[in-house]
Amino acid sequence: DMNDVVIYYSSTVVKDKSSNALVRTTTTFTPMNDGATYTNGFGFQLDYVGKEHIDLVQVSQEGNVIGKNFEPGIEKPVLILFSDIKPVLKKPVTVVIGFKKYDKVSDMDAYPPYNSFIFVNKRSHEVHLSGYKPTSVADESLRGTGSDLSQDSNGTPMYYIAEDNMPFAINISNSEFRWPSEKVSITTYYPEFKQWRDSFGADYKDWYLHPKE
């Protein structure tokens, strides 16, 4: 039904005028729905920017700074924003990340939505946006279990896609997205979703603007 976790986000990107290098990103994440009975946390990883390129990390909520550090013990920068989404529904969290002036970080390397993911009951049980790799602390033994498609017919690794090409998680550019009710299939609520899915995103790219009335 694609409603277990719904998070809205908006981002502001600041670039250096002379070099066009990325200076700072400010992103606000707002959990809007948690339709699952289990506990869902949320975080994101910067896949292409090392910690050595970052000189500022600040997480704030309601004007109060609640965090300044990446998750320890992981080589890549990972921020965990919520360990349980239910208590923080509709409570925005703002993340500011500053980049070192002379490192010339590309905005394509550090542009939202990042490698966002939820984790279900356990930190190691990650669910990422389809096509994104898990973090180094994810339980790799879960790959290929249940309906998970761990590789295509040519042996190419696949990430967070089911055997029927159903994505485990999606990112869309619509702040007015209407998610289906519990136990209502997204293919029923959004009739064009199936064609979009079956075409691997080539057709019906605005499916999310056309819910069933």
Predicted regions and their residues:
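Extracellular distal adhesion/interaction modules in secreted or cell-surface proteins
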Residues: 1-213
